[in-house]
Design a protein with these regions (language model features):
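Alpha-helical transmembrane segments in inner-membrane proteins
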Residues: 1-241
């Protein structure tokens, strides 16, 4: 999210959905193109200027793309199309069909390969960038590969589900707290925990009366943000001890 991938995928998907009523295949490739394009823009702006500049560039690109989505929605002539786009933006599994999953599978597989290739980089990064560099890791190349992998995964997912936040942040933290293993050994566990959290959220908005009028993305944000803050504070206290 900080590097603009999710915003890029969202903006391109909204454009294709409203103006072209694009089928799922085109939406998936458009989402990936938007995610990759947004990340590459952030990377080109900041790759010589350090992490802080990259985060600030990502925030700026996110704001710009968010404004683009708002502009597209404000120009929507059909109230039905606007309502459907709003529902999609808030997060829903209505469009996550078997056909969509089949279209997305090659892109998701390529993203997984990128992450798996850089598993050693992710393990060493837990000790800091300096330690990773002294162990022979090419930091810029590894970071670029990981970011491309994430962009592929995000771009192939958002056209099917809309923007559903915090699950991708919470699941790895829970996996690491429970298993206490390095990141490279938590890929599958994190994915399963994330899938379970998404399933619980989907069932809650469908069958729990209190959540009946909100969408999945809204529910995950309401519950996920405080929970993530609690996890971060808990980990900080453990490190302080």
């Amino acid at each position: 999210g900080l590097l603009g991938s999710s915003s890029g995928a969202t903006a391109v998907s909204v454009f294709l959905l409203y103006y072209f009523s694009a089928p799922m295949g085109w939406l998936l490739f458009g989402g990936v193109a938007g995610a990759l394009g947004a990340f590459l823009l952030v990377w080109l702006i900041s790759f010589r200027h350090g992490t802080t500049m990259m985060i600030l560039s990502g925030v700026a690109v996110n704001v710009l793309l968010g404004a683009a989505v708002t502009l597209l929605l404000s120009n929507a002539e059909s109230p039905w199309a606007l309502a459907e786009l709003y529902r999609w933006l808030q997060g829903s599994l209505v469009w996550a069909t078997a056909e969509a999953v089949c279209w997305a599978f090659p892109l998701i597989l390529l993203g997984i390969v990128c992450l798996y290739r850089e598993r050693r980089y992710l393990d060493l990064l837990t000790f800091g960038e300096e330690t990773a560099a002294t162990m022979g890791i090419n930091l810029q190349r590894s970071f670029f590969t990981v970011s491309i992998g994430v962009a592929l995964l995000v771009g192939a997912t958002i056209p099917q589900t809309g923007t559903i936040g915090f699950i991708g942040l919470i699941a790895p933290h829970l996996a690491r707290i429970w298993l206490k293993k390095p990141p490279s050994q938590l890929y599958l566990t994190s994915a399963l925990i994330g899938a379970l959290l998404l399933l619980i959220a989907d069932l809650a908005v469908q069958y729990v009366p209190f959540f009946a009028r909100i969408y999945i993305g809204t529910l995950t944000a309401i519950l996920g943000a405080p929970f993530l803050i609690w996890i971060l504070f808990t980990q900080q206290r453990r490190l302080a001890q």
